[in-house]
Amino acid sequence: MSGVSEPLSRVKVGTLRRPEGPPEPMVVVPVDVEKEDVRILKVCFYSNSFNPGKNFKLVKCTVQTEIQEIITSILLSGRIGPNIQLAECYGLRLKHMKSDEIHWLHPQMTVGEVQDKYECLHVEAEWRYDLQIRYLPEDFMESLKEDRTTLLYFYQQLRNDYMQRYASKVSEGMALQLGCLELRRFFKDMPHNALDKKSNFELLEKEVGLDLFFPKQMQENLKPKQFRKMIQQTFQQYASLREEECVMKFFNTLAGFANIDQETYRCELIQGWNITVDLVIGPKGIRQLTSQDTKPTCLAEFKQIKSIRCLPLEETQAVLQLGIEGAPQSLSIKTSSLAEAENMADLIDGYCRLQGEHKGSLIMHAKKDGEKRNSLPQIPTLNLEARRSHLSESCSIESDIYAEIPDETLRRPGGPQYGVAREEVVLNRILGEGFFGEVYEGVYTNHKGEKINVAVKTCKKDCTQDNKEKFMSEAVIMKNLDHPHIVKLIGIIEEEPTWIIMELYPYGELGHYLERNKNSLKVPTLVLYTLQICKAMAYLESINCVHRDIAVRNILVASPECVKLGDFGLSRYIEDEDYYKASVTRLPIKWMSPESINFRRFTTASDVWMFAVCMWEILSFGKQPFFWLENKDVIGVLEKGDRLPKPELCPPVLYTLMTRCWDYDPSDRPRFTELVCSLSDIYQMEKDIAIEQERNARYRPPKILEPTTFQEPPPKPSRPKYRPPPQTNLLAPKLQFQVPEGLCASSPTLTSPMEYPSPVNSLHTPPLHRHNVFKRHSMREEDFIRPSSREEAQQLWEAEKIKMKQVLERQQKQMVEDSQWLRREERCLDPMVYMNDKSPLTPEKEAGYTEFTGPPQKPPRLGAQSIQPTANLDRTDDLVYHNVMTLVEAVLELKNKLGQLPPEDYVVVVKNVGLNLRKLIGSVDDLLPSLPASSRTEIEGTQKLLNKDLAELINKMKLAQQNAVTSLSEDCKRQMLTASHTLAVDAKNLLDAVDQAKVVANLAHPPAE
């Protein structure tokens, strides 16, 4: 049908929230209507869901139901959004999918008339009903700001029309702007620099698809790298825009290319002779356009129109006659078809209702008896609230008028029946209030007569139909779950008011339980809770279900040793798909993974992230994650690599496991099956540690109780004598007992040969007095031997003071020797010392201890590298030596500045090291041709080793930056220093290799005297 302007539409973009008002209205179907007169219309509309089952609504009606009733019922249902003020802007379009034939349905037409007039022309399944915005206010930009739902709906409609009709025709610059505006609006929580990350952009490309935002032709014409850079740069320009600002910017940009507020029809004006014109109909009235270069000429304003009539002509043509106030004759417009004339008539009539004083229809129809009527009955003038009230009063609660196509992915066959009679449940006190309604404590009497304490979730009476479906979706999912650590569903009452009945757990939410009992809960118990929730999540993983809301507030405590996961209101089955795309805006941002915040993408991997946050909550005794941040700031922190800090009582191995779960790349996170094994090991380890600590607490070391006869402190008992084991060790006969070094230093009596009689002469040892040694009979306090008198206690006290003085003197000596050893080790770690020192190091003698030879040389620590002195050669014009020294200075600068620099400046000092290394390797490459071939292999190998050292230093730097705010920060800095030291040592080894090769080639000279 030529000349018919197809309205704008789009299916998959938008952000529409459901209202929280009165219940959804219903189109009343009289009880006495025969079955053949009942119809079910599938009306498509625009929504934010990628699930096709969410983009339409089935409306049950009769052949006598008017189109206006269907439109109003959908608007009041809340399916497209809340608080619609401009209801008169909406219309219903009937479109034939195979031929693009279009019919705009007048509000006063009945369903029966539509079927008799239009649907009979083609197969019924080939027709589609679309809810569209067709009539716009005069200043629609400002008017739509007052009605956010209509604004977003019109935007979605326009976006769809742009992608279908204009995207391939606009310039690349405009296509880039419009695509990035939609990116900013659609991913409104994404930070401005999110697309700079390669992983984020790949996720957008593969999982979401650039086809939603940019025309395919543009993607094919540009190189991928160039296209990506253009998107990143353009996106930065719109990063600060809010959703409404993106929409308005889109309108203004596209308006420069196409008319977004009017429809154009190619037709003929009949004025004695026929003039072919483009008739432009929009908020400004009816205008004609004779050529593209001229301005439109106004033919009539909508306030001037008094009547509209369509008359068929021969050869499928038709005439549209408009009666205009003050004009001697009507304005006659000749169209190519009757359908086109009727579509124009509906458009003009709609604008007359919107802008004119007369709210009824101006279209005149011929009756069967030949009589004319001036107009059809007026459309009811009730506003939305009054009509909502009127419809609610006229509808029966039990009537089954609206029915969504059931989501079969949420309804699984088999399993027990959960229907419960309301009289079997008695409600008691209110436990709390949820999003949908109150939660009650109650008692359920089952078929055996047993009384069971239950929790009853209720749904508010004024909840919309869509929210009721969401409320019931939790029960639908819980029907299929059976796990010892998942809340058990008892039953469902689907009749109004809807109830969901579940097990009652007296200890309540885990978050409150942790806060109340934080002084008594031990670490093994906390780890046990995490293990149990992990097992529940592994079960959900096995049935392809994502939870999306794992937090302590959604975990219930069944007993002090058992917790259960609940609240499946956000859960979804993902079936064979890899992920679930969220369409709601009420999401727990501080618990979510980066891909969930940026792209609303939920997978098992995002559940792993949330589970790790939940573990952090448990080990923090219920603290909220990122409680020091606002929701909008969380993604920026995560993008920088920052993570939650280690809780005080969290075992380091468990925190390491958490950080693995917080990997930015979802594919690098562990699965729940792996986490169950790891947590089981950690739990067993913590249990063993707790048992050992308890055993140590029971067996305390011996102590002397204070005598009651005096108030002075009692003397400390001397340490029990150690008797070595007999030499009949069956496992290792030659193995001797060795006292640990740390114990020797603090307890010299244990290693004194005078006080360790051998098994041979121990029988001839003279008996010891009571005040010299206390023999310990048991570890109980009441068995300790008390001194018999104050004098004996005083002697013990003096003897202990003498021994303590000897211990302190011996420890001071050892401290001096240890400090000397530490200084030598520090000199070993400083490459500058060995490169400039031409004599081997010797232990220094400390004044006052000349006779003391010191302890034997301690073995080198693991990882310490042996550094030899640099050759004593003439270094004049020696670029290799000069560059090595410069590199070492850069390493020392890194060592000295690392503690004071912020993490973002680490790259400056590391870059300085890298530049100096490049100069060093360049100078060696210049010298290499003059060196013997036999030496080149070693030199080239050392060069490769230096490159690896630099790569390791860079990796350690990145690790230190990522963990700057965590408890691992200092450890990461130490690793960074170790990597830099290794690089400096290998640089010195390269210098030695070059010096040796120069000696072989007779290129080296001794230093000038």
From Swiss-Prot:
Topology relative to the membrane: Peripheral membrane protein
Known catalytic reactions: L-tyrosyl-[protein] + ATP = O-phospho-L-tyrosyl-[protein] + ADP + H(+)
Region (Interaction with TGFB1I1) residue spans: 801-1009
Record-listed Phosphoserine modification sites: S361, S375, S399, S762, S839, S866
Activity regulation, per record: Activated in response to stimuli that lead to increased intracellular Ca(2+) levels; this activation is indirect and may be mediated by calcium-mediated production of reactive oxygen species (ROS). Activated by autophosphorylation at Tyr-402; this creates a binding site for SRC family kinases and leads to phosphorylation at additional tyrosine residues. Phosphorylation at Tyr-402, Tyr-579 and Tyr-580 is required for optimal kinase activity.
Posttranslational mods: Phosphorylated on tyrosine residues in response to various stimuli that elevate the intracellular calcium concentration; this activation is indirect and may be mediated by production of reactive oxygen species (ROS). Tyr-402 is the major autophosphorylation site, but other kinases can also phosphorylate Tyr-402. Autophosphorylation occurs in trans, i.e. one subunit of the dimeric receptor phosphorylates tyrosine residues on the other subunit. Phosphorylation at Tyr-402 promotes interaction with SRC and SRC family members, leading to phosphorylation at Tyr-579; Tyr-580 and Tyr-881.
Location (main, coarse): cytoplasm
Subcellular location, record wording: Cytoplasm; Cytoplasm, Perinuclear region; Cell membrane; Cell junction, Focal adhesion
Post-translational modification Phosphotyrosine, affected residues: Y402, Y579, Y580, Y722, Y834, Y849, Y881
Region feature (Disordered): 696-728
Skewed-composition ranges (Pro residues): 712-727
Positions with a binding annotation for ATP: 431-439, 457, 503-509
Modification type Phosphothreonine: residues: T765, T842
Gene Ontology terms: biological process: adaptive immune response; bone resorption; cell surface receptor signaling pathway; cellular defense response; cellular response to fluid shear stress; cellular response to retinoic acid; chemokine-mediated signaling pathway; cortical cytoskeleton organization
Secretion signal span: none
Enzyme class, UniProt record, top EC level: transferase
Domain FERM: 39-359
Consequence of substituting Y402A: Loss of phosphorylation and interaction with SRC, and inhibition of bone resorption
Annotated ranges, domain Protein kinase: 425-683
Physiological role: Non-receptor protein-tyrosine kinase that regulates reorganization of the actin cytoskeleton, cell polarization, cell migration, adhesion, spreading and bone remodeling. Plays a role in the regulation of the humoral immune response, and is required for normal levels of marginal B-cells in the spleen and normal migration of splenic B-cells. Required for normal macrophage polarization and migration towards sites of inflammation. Regulates cytoskeleton rearrangement and cell spreading in T-cells, and contributes to the regulation of T-cell responses.
Subunit structure: Homodimer, or homooligomer. Interacts with KCNA2. Interacts with NPHP1, ASAP1, ASAP2, ARHGAP26, SKAP2 and TGFB1I1. The Tyr-402 phosphorylated form interacts with SRC (via SH2 domain) and SRC family members. Forms a signaling complex with EPHA1, LCK and phosphatidylinositol 3-kinase; upon activation by EFNA1. Interacts with GRB2 (via SH2 domain). Interacts with P53/TP53 and MDM2. Interacts with MYLK. Interacts with BCAR1. Interacts with RB1CC1. Interacts with RHOU. Interacts with VAV1. Interacts with PDPK1. Interacts with DLG4. Interacts with LPXN and PTPN12. Interacts with SIRPA and SH2D3C.
Family: Belongs to the protein kinase superfamily. Tyr protein kinase family. FAK subfamily.
The protein, known as: Protein-tyrosine kinase 2-beta
